[in-house]
A protein has these predicted regions:
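Hydrophobic transmembrane alpha-helices of multi-pass solute/ion transporters
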Residues: 1-70, 83-87, 225-307
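Membrane-interfacial loop-to-helix junctions in multi-pass transporters
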Residues: 1-4, 55-61, 87-100, 129-136, ...
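Long, contiguous bundles of hydrophobic transmembrane helices that form the permeation core
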Residues: 3-6, 37-41, 173-267, 381-384, ...
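Short helix-coil transition sites and intra-membrane helix breaks within transmembrane domains
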Residues: 60, 72-82, 107-118, 147-154, ...
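Hydrophobic alpha-helical transmembrane segments of multi-pass integral membrane proteins
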Residues: 64-67, 89-121, 309-346, 358-363
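Re-entrant/interfacial helical elements at transmembrane boundaries that shape
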Residues: 83, 114-126, 154-164, 331-344, ...
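Alpha-helical transmembrane segments of multi-pass membrane proteins
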Residues: 95-107, 131-149, 174, 180, ...
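Membrane-core helix-loop-helix motifs of multi-pass transport proteins
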Residues: 129-218, 352-354, 374-410
Length: 415
């Protein structure tokens, strides 16, 4: 009964998401199914929910999502990102590398519609290379997401580290060779057949190059500050982001505009930038995870797998991929799958290899999902063919899965 309840809950979450319901409503409906199927008493329901809401993981992730999305919108609306893009375009003359770096930089900062922000910049470089619209869409979405497997401020990676026994750095170290190979494959695939002879303009003079580099670093300084505070000084993530917010509030003030007016508008950008939908979704996912852990379903799954000698590796590859692909949401794939698999995995480093592979396969499914918002928005911007784009991004998604499996096998059996 409990196992059937979880299967129904996951199916309900997927169907409701595809029907246009907000993710957090879909997950709350799934929680209700788990509660009914497990016959939790009112006292148990309140105890689990209260414990989940006051847990350090819940508090940390909620604060991270609130502060990071507000920070991203502030960077966008204050003009800092625009300065970054213009300076980078002046420094990097090869249109191919512009198409790689511009979406990657935009992707470092979390704000809704980021794919649309980088799309015009990618389009300008793409026209120089005579790329078709579909290829430009693939470049914009692929290079926007490619660094997330090693980016320490990526919410999906932070969620993995918070709800599993392994650290952020464990995942980054496992993913690093996969990232490097996937970058190479993606670059070759996107720019296959492209000739750049005669398209690369002359470089800037030393003084101009220095000025543009200073502008670039200045515009990115709040983000650089956050990363340094976290990686070097091990500062609590939400506090580090707040320091970055304070830095973003004071840089690139417009000349000739009253100070109070600029300060007021930037505070407004900050408040309006909070992505409450993502915040509520994180809260719902963590509550769902805790109800799963308190149910008997995990033991039922373990019993079924042991009785049928079903390979865990196959499930780790397909279940997260399918969940992310159908829902177009990496949070849901990670939040649903990680609690199910942790009890099934071997302890120590071998368990890490499974968890890292789970993360990569969920990213591959999310990357190629037909309801992934970045795909939808970019296709709409370029007026591109949906089937062609989905074919290309899912070819790259399949490559990511294969590279993840290869890394797993090498680490598991050879190292």
């Amino acid at each position: 009964m409990e196992l059937i309840g979880v299967l129904v809950a996951v199916a309900l979450i997927i169907v409701m998401t595809q029907k246009g319901f907000k993710l957090y409503w879909s997950i709350l409906a799934g929680i209700a199914v788990v509660i009914v199927s497990n016959r939790f008493s009112l006292e148990e329901i309140l105890s689990i929910a209260y414990g989940s809401l006051r847990s350090p993981t819940m508090i940390t992730l909620t604060l991270i999502v609130i502060t990071l999305t507000a920070f991203g919108n502030l960077m966008k609306e204050s003009g800092s990102l625009r300065v970054t893009m213009l300076s980078l375009s002046s420094l990097v003359k090869d249109p191919r590398y512009q198409m790689v770096i511009l979406p990657m930089l935009i992707g470092l900062i979390t704000f809704p519609g980021g794919a649309v922000f980088s799309a015009p910049l990618v389009e300008e470089a793409g026209h120089k290379l005579k790329l078709n619209r579909e290829r430009m869409v693939v470049a914009n979405t692929a290079f926007r997401h490619i660094q997330y497997m090693i980016y320490p401020l990526y919410p999906g990676l932070l969620l993995m580290a918070e709800i599993s026994p392994y650290s952020l750095y464990d995942y980054i170290l496992f993913n690093l060779p996969v990232f490097m190979l996937f970058c190479l494959v993606t670059f070759k695939y996107v720019f296959r057949g492209v000739k750049v002879t005669g398209l690369i303009e002359g470089g800037l003079e030393d003084n101009n190059r220095r000025n543009e580099l200073i502008k670039l670093l200045s515009s990115l300084s709040p983000l650089i500050l956050i990363v340094l505070l976290v990686l070097i000084f091990n500062l609590y993530f939400p506090v580090a982001i707040m320091v970055g917010v304070l830095a973003a509030l004071v840089i690139n003030y417009p000349v000739g505009k009253p100070l109070w007016e600029t300060a007021r508008s930037r505070l407004n950008y900050l408040v309006k930038g909070i992505n409450w939908s993502m915040t509520f979704s994180i809260i719902a996912i963590l509550i769902f995870k805790d109800f799963l852990e308190q149910s008997k379903v995990i033991y039922d799954i373990m019993a079924v797998m042991m009785e049928n000698n079903f390979p865990v590796l196959v499930l780790v590859v397909f279940l997260p991929f399918l969940t992310a692909f159908l829902m177009g949401n990496y949070f849901a794939a990670v939040g649903i799958c990680v609690p199910l698999f942790i009890p099934l995995l071997p302890p120590g480093e071998q368990g890490l290899y499974y968890m890292a592979l789970l993360f990569l396969t969920s990213q591959a499914g999310y990357f190629g999902s037909p309801i992934h918002m970045c795909n939808i928005l970019t296709i709409e911007h370029f007026k591109a063919s949906l089937p062609t784009v989905l074919k290309d991004v899912n070819i790259l998604g399949a490559v990511l899965v294969l590279l993840g499996i290869a890394a797993f096998l090498v680490r598991f059996y050879l190292l």
